[in-house]
A protein has these predicted regions:
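Terminal beta-strand-rich extracellular "head" domains
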Residues: 70-87
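Extracellular disulfide-bonded cysteine-rich modules/repeats
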Residues: 88-101
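Exposed extracellular interaction/assembly regions and N-terminal maturation sites
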Residues: 1-69, 98-106
């Protein structure tokens, strides 16, 4: 079997670490996640984010999950400054870094 590092995220603010691979978000509040730099030795780095809020009615209104580039960097996510993954119930996003300031959805 293959296992990947999994983090059950409940705080409303988090900076992804070098150990993170899969981040499951169970908080019912709005969540801001900061990505590591897409330029510092991260070519090919993969991160997976999954809304695991456990209620069938979906996330409460106003409780977006925002994925943000590294603070103080010029990094982009799909050419944008931030990415909201909570547009649907139980939404997810997988990102990879090109090692040159960009994160891409796949």
């Amino acid at each position: 079997a293959i296992y990947f590092n999994y983090l059950n995220l409940t705080p409303t603010s988090y900076t992804a670490s070098s150990a993170d691979y899969i981040i499951g978000i169970t908080s019912s509040a709005a969540v801001d996640i900061e990505l590591p730099s897409a330029s510092l030795g991260s070519k090919g780095r993969v991160l997976i984010f999954k809304d695991e809020y456990p209620y069938p009615s979906g996330r409460p209104t106003g409780s977006a999950i925002m994925i943000n580039p590294s603070a103080g960097s010029s990094d982009k996510i799909e050419g944008n400054g931030a990415y909201d993954i909570a547009q649907g119930n139980m939404a997810s996003i997988s990102l990879y870094s090109n090692g040159n300031g960009c994160w891409f959805v796949f």
